[in-house]
């Protein structure tokens, strides 16, 4: 039996809690340096950096699981993992329609950077990603299943 070292709850520079140094290449490179075999990107309410992290992970010989840390209407954080990048990006588009139009304030929450496949900044997310969606917790399991994914509560204290 092969054992894997993994981190299934990583944020990039897209998440308001992330640092601008948490670029796709840096995430994958550091994961390789510390001996991880598998990483999952779970930015807050977005999968927009998953394509770039998937490419960076492949370059470093890492397995990659696309994901998202979804904030429900009740402000519960749920980790959502997907079998494919396409499914994750489809889910991202769905969730985007359920986020409030609260603008990000970079001075307080950071820049929310989106990277392209060449590990360069392509744009910034203008809406604040740590806001709660209007999606109720009770609907998330079935919703994530529709996108060939699984969900796991992110924190034991909420």
Where does each model-flagged region fall?
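An N-terminally biased module of ancient metal coordination in phosphate/nucleic-acid-related enzymes
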Residues: 1-75
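Extended substrate/RNA-proximal surfaces in nucleic-acid metabolism proteins
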Residues: 3, 56-158
């Amino acid at each position: 039996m092969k054992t894997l070292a993994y981190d299934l709850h990583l944020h990039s520079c897209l998440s308001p809690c992330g640092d601008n140094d948490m670029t796709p290449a840096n995430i994958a490179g550091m994961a390789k340096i510390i001996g991880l075999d598998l990483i999952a990107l779970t930015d807050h309410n977005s999968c927009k950096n998953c394509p770039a992290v998937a490419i960076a992970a492949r370059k470093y010989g890492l397995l990659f699981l696309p994901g998202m840390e979804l904030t429900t209407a009740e402000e519960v954080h749920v980790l959502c993992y997907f079998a494919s990048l396409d499914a994750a990006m489809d889910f991202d588009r769905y969730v985007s329609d359920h986020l409030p139009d609260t603008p990000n304030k970079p001075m307080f929450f950071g820049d929310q950077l989106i990277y392209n496949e060449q590990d360069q900044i392509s744009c910034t997310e203008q809406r604040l990603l740590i806001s709660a969606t209007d999606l109720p917790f009770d609907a998330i399991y079935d919703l994530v299943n529709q996108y060939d994914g699984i969900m796991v509560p992110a924190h034991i204290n909420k």
